[in-house]
């Protein structure tokens, strides 16, 4: 029992009514938020003299203050609890990683030839959003299928607008070539309509419609069209066999939770319109001993109550039950305006799906724990290689990515003994440096990172790993000296002459200590892993930034030149490069271009 908290005096005045309680430490830091049918009974269970699990006892030992809020009923208590957990993320609560955006399939509506794409973030563009999906992988699978079946374009708008001949997707029959007018807007619109039917889960109606169209095409002796529709039906049937859930066309989420001494995993399978959209593993943070039912209840509350944009199914199939599920159903109905059913005892196909979710959760948790042990062993090997008294707890690695100085991005990735700490990853858009100057880019990124540390933001790494050898290591040391940052180890890594993995040269601190590690060294494998992850994270950020900069064609800056006229101009001159070389008189000879408009186009193309 806490020495600084008088539990007896507190419990003597505690209410027996439903409500929410908040536990604080001596520094007024919120440790834990909970709800209870009876506040007094629930809180008394924490302060009994024996029988507490070790992690729960550790929580109780830190309690210096408890605050309670009485609610009208358990439903209000659950809603308030979820609000507080989302806002404060107390360290002893069961917490999900806070996904800030969810993936959707986006169909543009402003284009003559609409595009299908994966979308995250704010819904600013006009069009239809299908989802959210459980993972980006599930969306890519659907997009790949739609591209095979209906050939709706998925290329970037800038790429689409500047084509003068069909791309490879047309050659391999994944696109009908709308960029160069090889398909009419009417035929393309029909393909888009069929794609929408599929995304809406109306696969059976779509298959019926395609079958009718196939028969009609055959009667007209249009065997090419009939064969195309036949292939589309075959793809649909194959998908239905692979992704359908027998027993109806309902919207169901199958959720299974597994808890072991090493951690917890929740596996979710999402079914909409009888079609499996995909699945995802979640690894909630569990700081105190919890039964599997408590973990599942906490997951469902955070997953469906904390994010209103998530699609709500009609039914949940779960692998364990909990006495508070009726309260959860009531809370979801109040917050979302819709009721759902939670099923535990299911039979037949539904039971097989339930078991599949359990199996996936078990396998995912087992793989995660094995990887955690693997990474921890590598951290111990690194400590031995660097002659450290104990393994480091936080490694940060920086890398730079650009294309000939364009759209320079620096990345910072973070690893701990349990693996990548992706919520701590950061990217830095580099500005104001000479194009291609990696040293200046590294100086700017490190200055921004460690200036924030000096201001009390973020955590100090034990080891700072810099990809680039002596030069970048010297730059990192210069930044740390400028900011008076001390107490960390600097480690530079340079590729060998052949640039093959296993031949890296390592430099410690001021580069006075140069050494190598055996190719089979676990310590070297850890260094390679974090370096490669930093490179991956930098290059994906660079490509996104470069793509955004290139997405707008120069011609889009010309008033009066819309998508059709841009396409006609590019087709007339054979591409943007040839168009840029044209004189005003040559531009004015293009169909639909007046002398005044030609002058405007020329001015924009030669503004630099």
From Swiss-Prot:
Pfam families: GIY-YIG, HHH_5, UVR, UvrC_RNaseH, UvrC_RNaseH_dom. GO terms for biological process: nucleotide-excision repair; SOS response. The keyword Cytoplasm applies. Transmembrane segments: none annotated. Its main location: cytoplasm. PROSITE patterns: GIY_YIG, UVR, UVRC. Signal peptide: none annotated. Belongs to the UvrC family. The UvrABC repair system catalyzes the recognition and processing of DNA lesions. UvrC both incises the 5' and 3' sides of the lesion. The N-terminal half is responsible for the 3' incision and the C-terminal half is responsible for the 5' incision. Interacts with UvrB in an incision complex. NCBIfam families: PRK00558.1-5, uvrC. This is UvrABC system protein C.
């Amino acid at each position: 029992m806490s020495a600084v908290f008088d539990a007896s005096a507190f419990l003597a005045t505690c209410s027996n009514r439903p409500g929410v309680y908040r536990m604080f430490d001596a520094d007024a830091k919120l440790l834990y938020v909970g709800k209870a049918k009876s506040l007094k009974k629930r809180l008394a269970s924490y302060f009994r003299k024996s029988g507490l699990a070790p992690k729960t006892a550790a929580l109780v030992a830190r309690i210096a203050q408890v605050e309670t809020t009485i609610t009208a009923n358990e439903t209000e208590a659950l809603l308030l609890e979820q609000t507080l957990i989302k806002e404060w993320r107390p360290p002893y609560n069961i917490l999900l990683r806070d996904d800030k955006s969810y993936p959707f399939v986006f169909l543009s509506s402003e284009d003559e030839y609409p595009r299908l794409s994966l979308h995250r973030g704010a819904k600013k563009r006009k069009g239809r959003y299908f989802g959210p999906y459980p993972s980006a992988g599930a969306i890519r699978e659907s997009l790949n299928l739609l591209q095979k079946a209906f050939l709706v374009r998925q290329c970037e708008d800038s790429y689409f607008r500047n084509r003068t001949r069909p791309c490879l997707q047309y050659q391999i029959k994944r696109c009908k070539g709308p960029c160069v007018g090889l398909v009419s807007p009417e035929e393309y619109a029909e393909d888009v309509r069929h794609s929408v039917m599929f995304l809406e889960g109306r696969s059976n109606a779509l298959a019926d419609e395609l079958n009718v169209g196939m028969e009609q095409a055959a009667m007209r002796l249009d065997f090419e069209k009939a064969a195309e529709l036949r292939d589309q039906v075959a793809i649909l049937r194959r998908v239905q066999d692979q992704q359908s859930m027998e027993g109806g066309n309902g919207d169901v989420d199958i959720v299974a939770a597994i808890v072991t001494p090493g951690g917890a995993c929740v596996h979710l399978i999402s079914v909409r319109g009888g079609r499996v959209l995909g699945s995802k593993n979640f690894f909630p943070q569990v700081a105190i001993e919890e039964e599997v039912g408590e973990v599942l209840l906490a997951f469902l509350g955070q997953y469906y109550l904390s994010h209103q944009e998530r699609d709500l199914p009609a039914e949940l199939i779960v692998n364990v039950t909990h006495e508070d599920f009726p309260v959860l159903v009531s809370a979801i109905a109040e917050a979302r305006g819709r009721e759902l059913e939670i099923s535990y005892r299911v039979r037949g196909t539904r039971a097989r799906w339930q078991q599949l979710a359990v199996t996936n959760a078990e396998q995912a948790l087992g793989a995660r724990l094995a990887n955690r042990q693997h990474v921890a062993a590598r951290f111990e090997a690194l400590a031995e290689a660097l002659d450290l008294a104990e393994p480091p707890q936080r490694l940060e690695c920086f890398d730079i990515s650009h294309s000939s100085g364009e759209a320079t991005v620096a990345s910072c990735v973070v690893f701990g003994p349990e693996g990548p700490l992706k919520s701590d990853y950061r990217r830095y858009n580099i500005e104001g440096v000479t194009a291609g100057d990696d040293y200046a880019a590294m100086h700017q990124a490190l200055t921004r990172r460690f200036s924030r540390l000096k201001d009390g933001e973020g955590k100090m790494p034990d080891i700072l790993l810099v990809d680039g050898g002596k030069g970048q290591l010297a730059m990192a040391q210069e930044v740390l000296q400028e900011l008076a940052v001390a107490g960390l180890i600097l480690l530079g890594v340079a590729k060998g002459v052949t640039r093959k993995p296993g031949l890296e040269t390592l430099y410690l601190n001021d580069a006075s200590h140069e050494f190598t590690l055996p190719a089979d060294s676990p310590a070297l494998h850890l260094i390679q892993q974090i370096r490669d992850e930093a490179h991956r994270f930098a290059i994906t950020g660079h490509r996104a930034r470069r793509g955004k900069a290139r997405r707008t064609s120069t011609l889009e800056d010309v008033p009066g030149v819309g998508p059709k006229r841009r396409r006609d101009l590019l087709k007339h001159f054979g591409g943007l490069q040839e168009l840029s070389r044209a004189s005003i008189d040559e531009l004015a000879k293009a169909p639909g271009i007046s002398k005044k408009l030609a002058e405007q186009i020329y001015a924009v193309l030669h503004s630099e």
